[in-house]
Amino acid sequence: MQQTFKHWQIAPDTYAIQCPGYLPGPGRLPGWGYVICYLIVGREKAILLDTGYGNADLKAEVESLTDKPVLCLNSHVHPDHSGGNQQFGTVYILEGERETIAPMYFPQPPERERCDMVRALPDYRFAFLQEGSVLDLGGRSVEVLRLEGHTPGSMVLIDSQTRFLFSGDAILKRVLLMAGQPLSQYRAALERTKAHGGFVDIYGAHWYEPLGADYIDKVLALIDDFSPDRCESAPWMEANNMMMFCHGNAFEEKDFAAIGFGEKDMALMLR
């Protein structure tokens, strides 16, 4: 288990912060792995996207990188992305993420088992952004989009300066569909994001390398090839009866793509 923060600059005034947490296992089906937050710094303020497990002083790490006031956003409110929220007071999420909030307050297994230092009760408040909002950081703007599928109100950000899309868990090499929505709805959300454009690379929360904008096409192709016969048990979440389907043989491969879903949701995958 990684015990300290690690950060690196992915572009001028743009940082990836790898939070303390479980490192991924090798091979085709690594575990949940580390969580990466992103810090986007403008002339007047900064955005922090996600807060990790909450088991270390993320605020101090952020303050070591910028002295600007920080707007804290959650791409979604799963505990590995919102665990450090209490360090920031007010946290912004998409309006569509309201329905995900209630079940996600700490402590929640298996997160409690993974990290025994999380707070039992939140002492922060959520504020809500609308899809299409543009956040002005001073000489740098960040657009807020919705890309539902992993959760009903998953937020992605497009940064005008770098033309990076920060995807949280909405676009990853292995996406878990947990919103209770049809696979076709996730596909439509991907198509909507692709049509919006304005980005050249995708930075997700559980992989340290960027995915090119064309990675969306790889996920769309995977969805179009979906068949129940190609699905298999997802070993990283056997206790939760998760299934998966994928292209590629190893997670580390550039073109690897996988989608996981609950076994009980097979009918949703066919709609």
Regions found by a protein language model. Name each.
Residues 5-64, 156-172:
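Conserved beta-strand hairpin/beta-sheet module of binuclear metal-dependent hydrolase folds
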Residues 28-29, 53, 105, 176-181, ...:
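Short, solvent-exposed loop/turn segments at secondary-structure boundaries
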Residues 53-136, 173, 224-236:
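Active-site HxH/HxHxD metal-binding segment of metal-dependent hydrolases
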Residues 131-158:
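Core dinuclear metal-dependent hydrolase active-site scaffold
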